[in-house]
Amino acid sequence: MKNHRSMHILICCYMLLYFGIGIKVDAVADSEASPVKGIPSYRASEEPPLYKTIESAKTYIVQHQNRDGGWPLVPGGESNVENTAFAIWGLIDAGWGTGSQVIRMGVMYLRNTQWDNGSWNNNTAHTVFALVALATAETDPEIRFKGLQWLKKAQNPTGAWGKKERSADNVLYTAAVLAGFRRLGFKQNFAPVSKGADWLAESINYDSGWALQRGTQSDIFVTSWVIQGLEPVYDIDAQIAWLKQLQNNDGGFGRYKNRPSDPEITAIAVMALAAGNDPLNTRRVSINYLTSIRQEDG
């Protein structure tokens, strides 16, 4: 695991482990033997590894909140919007109270960093993630409305979004915005969702995956975000099948086929599988991978 990405990876994995997969901490299935060779199983009388992972991650995240209320990419670094949004989102969905000091400080950071135009950093992904965090915290409707208006304005005539307002169409940023809209509850009848989904659908590769540049090798990370964004509008069964075929033997996912498993990519991939209501054990195998590679510090 790369140290300079550890905080971002942790938060992504934490989000995934607790709410993206739809598995309760006390699920009976947590006492089953691991289906992946090399990953240890455990007895029903022992504390489930998933529970340990979640609790350790919660503690680690809270301990590394900065004084300004935000969270950094790496402990001791400067706060940034993306990690702060993910931290708020994940903690609340894990049962952290919206009125707690930790959440209130995080919300304050997002409130203080919104730009006058309604965006966060003039960045479409940062903006939608901040909106999800504030909506999850059930606060600041006026700020959220202002951010939503900016996102609608930033959508290109093609239906896509770029990184910033009036920047070139980008598959990953379009997918991230649509995934955020999905979390916010917007459906096909919301024009930005249907237009954006149509643009993404037209950008598909021949193998049912997506890449940053159409026609290049399909990218598991990009495709996993796209799947989440398309789910409210399109049937994604073929994309779920494509994704499952690329899972590594250890249960994780790499960026491309046969590449080493990566925690962040695995987390995003399982969020995509959850969006597709995958009926098999693919998500479960990935969870075992993520719990097995957790560092001692949480």
Regions found by a protein language model. Name each.
Residues A57-Q63:
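Mature N-terminal segment immediately following signal peptide/propeptide cleavage
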Residues K2-L10:
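Bacterial N-terminal signal peptides that target proteins for export
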Residues D30-S56, G70-V102, D116-Q149, P157-D198, ...:
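An alpha-helical repeat/solenoid feature that recognizes helix-turn-helix modules
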Residues G22-S31:
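Sec-dependent signal peptide cleavage junction
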Residues L10-G20:
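Bacterial N-terminal signal peptides
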